């Protein structure tokens, strides 16, 4: 790392440099813009340009001092059309009081006062000058300073402060926004001292895939589901399946009839013949043929 021109109090700690390297903030693109050449450390044999992380830290501190110079935090607009930076700008806005535009930038936000989303910020911060070109172009029309996270191949036209870093990796983008928010809070006095650790983890600024998180949650629910829980209900699951089955609505007569039925065999022969029973009914005149027999005429034809 090159010697820093900052005062001693602004020098990065060893942990800050290690975090920048771990998040691969130093890995730039293979293409190089001429205006980004001063931030280049060297070029690897595979063609990847390595960014000087010391310059990255200097520009983070410079950008934080510019942000703190604005009295009203709501006059600062942070923008990210790149999905990897949308979560980071929302968290940055929540911690510093800025206004976030995550997603598509509506043309005319800074120039067309008729639109409902018209804004007049005093400073804008963008994640990528290439994907956020519309915001930078409109800012140039109304004289709004621009701070941008710039890679080796990023256009720097109308960019006032370029923070050299890898603006294509999810970890690199999240870490730079996290460091920028922490430095702003330090300069504002929200953090007691520069030695005090910020209780917000860097993971909060990292991009998370919604589909992956949803699949992870559904997989966890399936693993935690107890077999047979749908049949017995949640109460039995909570009791650990220790409750006994309840028997209700059975009378004593039901058990008596069952006992009586058990004494006889189902394949036993009946005691009387059905034909004999029919004959008996006919003889007594109680059967269905009794009326026919009694209604016969006295004489036959």
From Swiss-Prot:
List the biased-composition ranges (Low complexity): 274-295
Species source reads: Phaeosphaeria nodorum (strain SN15 / ATCC MYA-4574 / FGSC 10173)
Instruction: Enumerate the subcellular locations listed in this protein's record, separating them with semicolons.
Output: Cytoplasm
Sequence segments annotated as region (Disordered) = 261-301
Task: For this entry, list what GO says about its biological process.
Answer: cytoplasmic translation; ribosomal small subunit assembly
Q: What does this protein do?
A: Required for the assembly and/or stability of the 40S ribosomal subunit. Required for the processing of the 20S rRNA-precursor to mature 18S rRNA in a late step of the maturation of 40S ribosomal subunits.
Q: Which InterPro entries match?
A: Ribosomal_uS2, Ribosomal_uS2_C, Ribosomal_uS2_CS, Ribosomal_uS2_euk, Ribosomal_uS2_euk/arc, Ribosomal_uS2_flav_dom_sf
List the molecular function annotations (GO) for this entry.
structural constituent of ribosome
What quaternary arrangement does the UniProt entry report?
Answer: Component of the small ribosomal subunit. Mature ribosomes consist of a small (40S) and a large (60S) subunit. The 40S subunit contains about 33 different proteins and 1 molecule of RNA (18S). The 60S subunit contains about 49 different proteins and 3 molecules of RNA (25S, 5.8S and 5S). Interacts with RPS21.
| Signal sequence, start to end | none
For this UniProt record, the keywords arranged alphabetically read as follows:
Cytoplasm, Ribonucleoprotein, Ribosomal protein
Q: Which GO terms describe its cellular component?
A: cytosolic small ribosomal subunit
Name of the featured protein: Small ribosomal subunit protein uS2
- Cross-referenced Pfam families: 40S_SA_C (PF16122), Ribosomal_S2 (PF00318)
Say which family it is in: Belongs to the universal ribosomal protein uS2 family.
């Amino acid at each position: 790392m090159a010697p820093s021109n900052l005062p001693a109090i602004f020098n990065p700690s060893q942990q800050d440099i290690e975090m920048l390297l771990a998040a691969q903030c130093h890995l730039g693109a293979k293409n190089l813009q001429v205006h980004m050449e001063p931030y280049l450390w060297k070029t690897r044999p595979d063609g990847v340009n390595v960014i000087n992380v010391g310059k990255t830290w200097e520009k983070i501190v410079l950008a934080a001092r510019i942000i703190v110079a604005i009295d009203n935090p709501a006059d600062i607009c942070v923008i990210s059309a790149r999905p990897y930076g949308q979560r980071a700008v929302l968290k940055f806005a929540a911690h510093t009081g800025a206004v976030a535009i995550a997603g598509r930038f509506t043309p005319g936000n800074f120039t067309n006062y008729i639109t409902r989303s018209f804004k007049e910020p005093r400073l804008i911060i963008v994640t990528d000058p290439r994907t956020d070109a519309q915001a930078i172009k409109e800012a140039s029309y109304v004289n709004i300073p621009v701070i941008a996270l710039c890679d080796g191949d990023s256009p720097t036209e109308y960019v006032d402060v370029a923070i050299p870093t890898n603006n294509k990796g999810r970890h690199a983008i999240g870490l730079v926004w996290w460091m920028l928010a922490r430095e702003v809070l330090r300069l504002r006095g929200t953090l007691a001292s520069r030695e005090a650790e910020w209780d917000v983890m860097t993971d909060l600024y990292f991009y998370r895939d919604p589909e992956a998180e949803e699949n992870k949650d559904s997989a966890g629910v399936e693993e935690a589901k107890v077999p047979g829980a749908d049949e017995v209900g949640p109460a039995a699951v909570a009791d650990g399946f220790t409750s006994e089955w309840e028997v209700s609505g059975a009378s004593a007569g039901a058990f008596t009839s069952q006992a009586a039925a058990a004494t006889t065999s189902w394949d036993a022969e009946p005691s009387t013949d059905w034909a004999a029973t029919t004959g008996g009914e006919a003889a007594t005149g109680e059967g269905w043929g009794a009326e026919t027999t009694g209604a016969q005429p006295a004489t036959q034809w």
